[in-house]
Amino acid sequence: MRSRVPRKEIKSLAFALYDTGETILGALVVSTFFPLFITKHIDVKIYSLSYGISLLASFALAIFLGKLADENALRKKFFTLFSLLTSLFLSSIALLYGTPYLALLSFLLMLISHQQAMVFYNSLLLNFENKGFASGLGVSFGYVGSAIALIFLADKLKEPEVYAVVGLIFLILAVPSIITLENPEISAKISLKEIFGDRTFLLFLLSLLTLTEVANTLIAMMGVYLREVYSLESVEIYRIIGFSALGGVLGGIFWGVLTDKLNVNRVFPLGFFLWSFFFILLFFAKKDYLIFVGLLAGFSLAHLWSTSRVYILENFPKESVSVRMSFLSLTERVASSFGLFLWSFFLFITQDNFRLSALLMGTLPLIGFFIYLKTKLD
């Protein structure tokens, strides 16, 4: 008798493949090709302002659509719609390449669609029995997707076809989720006033912000830190970042399995101490131990991305999952800006002492832990 793969494993794989496509899109288009292209034709300030406005518009739309989806059980339909629109707007950039302002408009519409898709994508975890494993596997596949994008695709793809190719890759990797993932049928009347007034939820988001701030700062500044503190060459920096990706792959699986076995309420708080330990280690680390530091960086990032969305699913009303996931998305966006602002401030007050500035960043997770404790007391 032919053995069959259990359905929950198929669903987990489909979920992870979507994460792969999402990270390929982010690594190749959002972070690399499009910014380099558009800033040759449009003032950087206009691009930055447009990008920021699109994120605010995306959050406002996510709140509205999230409420609509939660009240009418439309999460899967919105996930499918915005996944298809993401691919469409991304591919359209190739056709509009000769008219930069129209290309920018298509890019911004792609960003907004992508953010909506991610909100409803995270909401679909609601139906998983093995939420931790599915989330962690998605994180692991995301790291693999980034590696594939930067190592194998970045040098081979050229503009403008890169946008059509990545749009197609994203669509192909989204299809398994569109076909196999089920719509959570939970629905209820949603009060935005109650959610905005949910003290426990807002305190959790604030505690989470302390982690996402240090995580996004690490992603943005790790290469610069290694160059300034250890005088590493580019090849050595790439090697350490590569080991960080390996730590992310291993960490996604590890934290996902641990979350299912121990419960996310036990696993998530470990992140506050994990990140503080990382920055203490970074302060004292000698050059010979940087590979281990890189592994720990990826391992810590994997913990954050694997557990945060599961924590929301398990600790707050499931009827309002889409609205709450839109707040998770906003937290990640805010952290990208505020974390870098704080890093710059620490460099300023320490007179460009990178080691000490990193150590100061390590105090944020400890502050976050005390905020998190307030959620339990409440």
UniProtKB/Swiss-Prot annotation:
TM stretches of this protein: 12-34, 44-66, 92-112, 132-154, 161-180, 200-222, 235-257, 267-285, 290-312, 327-349, 356-373
Top-level lineage group: Bacteria
One Pfam family per UniProt: MFS_1
Membrane topology per record: Multi-pass membrane protein
SUPFAM superfamilies: MFS general substrate transporter
GO cellular component: plasma membrane
Compartment list: Cell membrane
UniProt keywords, alphabetically: Cell membrane, Membrane, Transmembrane, Transmembrane helix
Example of a GO MF term: transmembrane transporter activity
Record's protein name: Uncharacterized protein aq_1569
